[in-house]
């Protein structure tokens, strides 16, 4: 009995040493592997339990190792450079170790507890768990490197698991002892250590010792089983083993056969899959070829469609440009329609359809049975259209202002439809996205003027309003003297014209104008404009060559038409509404008259139409914005606005022309203006002089009836200025002749004159005129009066002939009535006396019958030769009395026939300036004066044969 305890203690010591060796070997493997994975970290190749635990206590080494095996397993590692045995911080302990254990559990590897790393609780069991965890990581890493093949991963948790059964049995045989002494030894050892330890660690040690006792019991039981199997019959045992082995072989053979069959089936399936793969490959190639062909065809089709689309777009663009060109050539008023968004989302809209071609369909939602109305305009802007999109459609029209064209844009519609918003923008602010057309237009004009460096532009701005039919300046405090020009154009000479240099100046002027503009809230609009606002931009450009362009841009914000029952206007608002509706009604009348091409356009019925006359009926490009409200209760106003806009679109203003003037044309115009002014001054001087002369004539004419009227004289061919006071007929008044007889007499006179000229050229006769003596005071006074009568030159006379006549001595002819003189026509010395007798007989027979009618016919025939617009007052330089004529023409020798004899005779008949006063009127006709040889007195009546001679001369 004494030998058993010694045998048991020997066996226990041997087992403990073997366990220690195996534990040291595993620590060596773990340390070596950790160093190979993460590099040297200050741990020896054969560390003790304390050194190993101290190296891995902070968790940095373990986290780095598992991150090498499984990248990203521990996303955050709290680093600590110290690798000594100092205790780690709580943060490192709970962060690194916790993250490592979580990662190990995800890999389904054996792990340990965080309490195993406590310094005061280091024993073989806790260190073994840590080493087992590291070894399992090593095995997992090697398994991963092999690609995860060759079976499943197996983990060895303790050194006792590798011990073979035979080795255990030999140890048991050698020991040959029971477990009772060992148990006593364990109890004794436990009782010896119990007073020196605390309660907590004692419990844990007791559990570990209990595990060891259970393990020893299991080993002893296995040794007993082995001893029992040896005591059996070896033959039976061999037979049993062989039978079991055969069964295993048969089962393995059947499994092999099954696996072979499965392999064959899989091989056949693989062959089928290969054939299918080949077929699929062929099909894929075929489909690929077809796909490529389809892509090529599709590309061709797309290219054709793109060409067609490009051609279509180009055709649409050309059509649009041609349409715009046609509109410009016709001068139609362009009409854009803009729809205001619904104020209340629950309201019913009267707009049913908006077409891309500029068509709009409206219907009364309150009366669905009514007929739908369709209107066509140049452009329709929906409720979601921005200010920038609206301006882009009008930008080309506004930029033409810089080219010299006049442009007018006005907004029309009922109150509250968004006219002021379109033209001036919102009242709250001036953001770049909400700017009105007025601001964006001026900004664009400044950009264009800056880009054109070869042209210098001067831009001025005027802003006025029409409030209750009164024009007021919005840029000036004093608006009492504003008036329109007399020609009715959009020209306000008294309105303040402000130069602008930048968009900021424009914004300041706009704000000033909006501040002064009349506006007040109504039941339909909280900011209702109570006046028509007109913004005029004057652009004057001058290029390097001196060419000048003058144009103007008129931006008109009309006040909205309103119904008094809806707007609830009273007092001043009612008066304003009445004036607004009246002016808009006048505008409608003007548009209707222009559309119907009436001869009379009522521009002067309103100040608004007066100011818009140059845009509606002049040389300007005009655009109208028709604003409508989509609400159902505004359907009547909407329909009225659309009808008005449709009438306006039919108005043709004609082709607008650029207001360009070259330097040469401007200089010529200035010269023409200077000449006109000089001519006007000259005409003024002449009119004043003529007024003085007429005054003298009237004063002298009053004295003529008081004197004794002169005796009737014969008709003088030189004097054609006779009037109604001609020679009275002694036999009484005669009945007037018919028009046919007068024309016949007129022809007879011309034939007689031509015959007389022919007779003079061939016979060389001389015409002589007898003048009355200067003793007759009445005749002298009449001659003085007649000198002031207008003498008109012959319009058909060549200037050279007139100059030659002046140089030859022709002077102004006195147009004297027949009653003021006693003129005798005599034929000079001729070789044929019968001709003189015949002439006297013809004159005496016709003088008593056709005297007055002949004079009228001569006057009418000669008056037709005179151009009325060239008549002027020519005063005779010197009054030639009969005495002077007698003294100056006392030569009895017949004069020779000169080449310009007929020209002088025509001048005497038509009132052209005669030769100088030194020659007598008889000598001017080419004859010889017989004043000196005339024996008759001043008041002696002419002989009877004188009439016959005159008739013969005719």
Swiss-Prot record:
Q: Where is the composition biased (Polar residues)?
A: 831-849, 886-898
Q: Where is the signal peptide?
A: none
* Residues the entry annotates as binding ATP: 413-420
Does Glycosyltransferase show up as a keyword for this record?
Answer: no
Concerning CDD domains, the annotation shows: CH_AtKIN14-like (cd21203)
Note the coiled coil stretches, chain numbering.
Answer: 242-293, 656-692
**Gene Ontology, cellular component aspect:** microtubule; microtubule cytoskeleton
Highest lineage ranks of the organism? Answer: Eukaryota, Viridiplantae, Streptophyta, Embryophyta, Tracheophyta
Q: What is this protein called?
A: Kinesin-like protein KIN-14A
